[in-house]
Amino acid sequence: MEILGERMLLRPLNLSDSERLVSLINASVNELREFMPWMRENVTRKEEDEYLLRAVQEMNLNQAFHFAMVLKESKEVIGVIATHPIDWLNESVSIGYWIATAFSGKGYTTESVVLLLEGLFMELKLHRVAVSTTTDNVASNRIIEKIGFRFEGVQKLAGKVAPSRWKDLNTFALLDTEYKSMRKNLFEKFLGGKYPKVKLA
């Protein structure tokens, strides 16, 4: 599945993304490691290849989706947005994302989340999408809130960010009915009024 928006393209990750992702991660590690325990100095090509192999396998088995966040005009990969394993029985999933520091604050992540929601709700017909973020991750909380996710509560010390170090998590969710009621407004607000184009594999 590929999803095209106003400025962003979400496309499945593949092994050829490894070198670019290693470069982005290592350039952004100081800003992002507070919120992501796996993100540390000197992420290696081998480690990234292993992640990408797992991601491709999960996508092939329809277990989860891992997308490169790509600038539509320049074709640059600037981050990753993905689902955790999908609960097909209950038609629900949680999502996560990161963007390289050099590209943050420009609305790219917000657009990418909206594009992913379109794919999950309108194409995969899921019922519920959730996201958790540390309570001190101001940028991520702001993105989720302005899109319209519903705040469900705080999970006490549920996010491990370093060995023997945990943080509280804010938990948000959105139902299919809620998304459909705000869908047009989201496109006007974050996609210049254009509807996303979803291409199924």
What function would you assign to each model-found segment?
Residues M1-R20, L24-E31, H66, V70-A201:
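Acyl-donor (CoA/ACP) binding surface of acyl/acetyltransferases
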Residues N26-V29, R40, V56:
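Residue-level detector of secondary-structure transition/capping positions
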Residues R33-L53:
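Conserved GNAT-fold acetyl-CoA-binding loop/helix
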Residues L53-A68:
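A short helix-loop-beta-strand connector motif used in the catalytic cores of GNAT acetyltransferases and
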